[in-house]
Every structure is written in structure tokens, then in C-alpha cells.
């Protein structure tokens, strides 16, 4: 399994005992508190917005700037806290939330690793913010809703071939996204956008989606987002921007979320999926699946069949197994085989008894905890205490978050070890352009004026103009490609000269 991918997560933020606290200011405090550790240079490189265009639509048009909602204008430098880290990630303020965007990785296990590093970075940032003079105590949550009507995102990004028809992506992904929440939902107490409805549901995001396809990410949220901003060579690539996922604490859930999606994308790119799994009323189906933790709800397909979400996922799994056998035979890599096996085992257990997966999946682990409280204290789902337990599950503090306490007690299955997570807080992946970005920031940070996913801009002594080094190929700038060069160059001037042939 080899596909460039990444995760960007907006964290929930709370300032206890400060009812008038400004979320934007608190988020900036968090980001700025971590900057001296995450980017320890004499100057802080700014984010390079030049190549960003959030209003370009994959359906072949561009939204007029004056017609766009201000929340869509993510290419404007508003002067908010924004740090590029030595691990190749971005830590910044987005929509009044601190956001961590992982560096580009090439497989779901590495996505888990650098995503988990983001949790540790956020916990450390909040701790350091509290230690500042006049600093607030700030609590961060890796969740998706405040249960007051607001939702904030955990977005996935996948590099795809530009030649893949977008209509095929829409047709095959909508049923998959409607149903994958059975294993990657984070679980939520409350029904409806404001959470006032009584009950428990699989997904934190399902109630906030309104349309099937669209450009927006905060208004009229679509199941398929059409933003066409590849952050790479636009002639060769598109970046599929997936906004429908929950923020997962579980490493297994994150791994399955990205691994299964990557397999489905491979089938779409290769034109392998001939069956049409389209469901009727996808937005309504998305919510109906989420609202039924018994997993018995049956979706109606366009071909007349009725299937549960687990059964429809089994259909995708069967196609994926056929695809892998057809394309690779016995020469399949270990991670692809592992994703397929875990996908199947998970679906079989969900069909038998979901509670068997309390060590693997967030929604099941959370439901197990909540049912314990309900039985001991005879609590209805409307009890405020249950919403507090729900929230505490996502607390990123190692000693306070319920998920982290389950891990400490050996009650959650893991994929990556803590030593690797700690390393990933500071070191970039070796096999994408994030390696070049991160190593440049670590070694030549004082001479980097700006950077982005697709460029690093140097401010060299004796040069009147800034020197832009484009990084439009996500699989160049790797350790194998530039590692020796970076080790050999003693200055940024020497590096840029080597890259440009001395121009």
C-alpha cells in the first residue's frame, strides 16, 4: 500500500473558569507556546499562501471570491498564529481552533504515527501555554462537536491521479463514506446538531452534513468535498479532500479509516469497481446509520437491495480482495494484506457483537464506558454527566483523557509505540517531500522566510530577492533523494546553489 495521504485535525478548545475567553486568542496562545519547541529557529517561517486556491472546484469551475463565505477564504494571511514544525507538519489557528496537519506520509500506519504525534504536540502546547505569564489553563479535545450546534473537522487528504473522472469518485465513494462510520465513528452522546435528542450514535459528524456534493467545509457540508487544491503538480494530481470523518483517538480506527479508503481509491483509479452501490437519500442514510448503534438499520440501494451498513462494507471488502488478487496475485505487500484482514475481522465482529471491539474502535470503547455509568447510576441518555464522560474521552492530557487512561491500563489495542510517537513529534517522514521541508527547517530555519506543502522559500544573505524552491512532486525531496545533500551542505546558501545549479 503506497499512497500519499495526511490528516488535519481541528481540536476542541476550552478555557475553564473563563466564560469570556476568546477562542481565537486562546488558540493562538496554544500555537505560539509550542513554536519555540516545534520550530526552534531565530525566525519563525511564515506560511506561504501563494499557490493556494480554495475556491477552485473539481467539477470544472471556480467560485467567485465575492460570492464565497469568508470561512472558505483559507488562502488569506490573517496574521493568525501559524507554525511550520520540524517534523514537516503545520500547527496553526483555523476557525478559532488550534489545528494540526500531519506531514505527508505514504501509508496508513505512518498516518497513525504522525497523527498521534499531533496529539502529544497539542497536549504539550496547552501545558506550556498555561505556564506563560498570565497564561490560561487551556484544555484541548480531539473531538468534533461542542454539542451546542458547532462542529469542527478532522479532514483526510489523499493524492490521486488527475485523470480519474470525478464522477466516478463521487459515485463509488458516497456509499462507502455513508457506511464506513461503523468502524471509524468516534461515538457521540446526543442526537441532532445541538445534541439535544436523547441517545447515542456512531459518528460525531453525521448530523452536520446536508448535501451530497459541494465545495463548502463549514456551511452546507457535503459528503464529497469538491475543493480542487492539489498542493502538487495540477496537471498530474488531484488532492481528494475528505471532510466527513470523525477525529479518532483509537489507532486501529484511524488505520482502518485511511487504509480502507486508500484501497477503494485504488479501485476507482484503476476502473475496477463495476458494481454500483449507490444508496437512496445518502444524507438521510448517513444519519440513520449513525443513529443506530445496533447496526441493524437497512439502507435501500438503487438496485432495490436492502443492506445494513456492515453488509455494504462487506461488499466493498469483497471487491477489494478481488482487486488485490487481480492486480498483485501473491505479491501483495504486508500492509495491504493487514488492512484487508483487519477490515474483514472488524466487520465480522461488528455483525456478531460490536462490543467485542471495545479494545479497537472508539465508538464501542466509549459506549462500553457510558453503559457502565448508565447501569451503575441508572442514568438516561439525556443525563449531562454522560456528555461530560463523552467529552473526557477525547481529552488529550495523558493523565486525564479517558482514552489515554484506557491505554495506560492496557485496555486499547495499539499500532505504534510511544517512543516512535515521541520521535515523530520532531522528525519528518523519510519518504515524502515532508523530509526536505522538515530537515530544512531544523537545519536552516533562520534562513527560511516561508514554506508550504509545495514550496520552501529561503532568505539568503547577500541576495536581494527570496529564493523559492518548489516541491510540487510529493514523492521527491525524500531522504533517499536529498538526505546526503542536506547532510553535506553547511549553509542554506550552499544548499540552494546545489539545487539550482549555482544560479
From Swiss-Prot:
Active-site residues per Swiss-Prot or TrEMBL entry: 94
Protein name: Depupylase
Outcome when changing residue 221 to A: Abolishes depupylation and deamidation activities
Complexes and interactors: Likely interacts with the C-terminal half of the prokaryotic ubiquitin-like protein Pup.
Record-linked Pfam families: Pup_ligase (PF03136)
Superkingdom assignment: Bacteria
Cofactor: ATP
Record key words, sorted: ATP-binding, Hydrolase, Magnesium, Metal-binding, Nucleotide-binding
Family assignment from sequence similarity: Belongs to the Pup ligase/Pup deamidase family. Pup deamidase subfamily.
MF terms in GO: ATP binding; hydrolase activity, acting on carbon-nitrogen (but not peptide) bonds, in linear amides; metal ion binding; peptidase activity
NCBIfam families cross-referenced by the UniProt entry: depupylase_Dop
Residues at which Mg(2+) 1 binds: 8, 92, 99
Family matches, as InterPro entries: Pup_deamidase, Pup_ligase/deamidase
Function: Displays depupylase (DPUP) activity, removing conjugated Pup from target proteins; is thus involved in the recycling of Pup and may function similarly to deubiquitinases (DUBs) in eukaryotes to prevent or promote proteasomal degradation of certain proteins. Is also able to catalyze the deamidation of the C-terminal glutamine to glutamate in a variant of the prokaryotic ubiquitin-like protein Pup; however, since Pup from A.cellulolyticus possesses a C-terminal glutamate, this deamidase activity may be of no significance in vivo.
Residues at which ATP binds: 101-102, 157, 239
Free-text cofactor note: ATP is required for the deamidation and depupylation reactions but is not hydrolyzed during the reactions.
EC number from the UniProt entry: 3.4.-.-
Residues where Mg(2+) 2 binds: 8, 155, 241
Effect of residue 8 to A: Abolishes depupylation and deamidation activities
GO BP, sorted A to Z: modification-dependent protein catabolic process; proteasomal protein catabolic process; protein pupylation
Pathway(s) it belongs to: Protein degradation; proteasomal Pup-dependent pathway
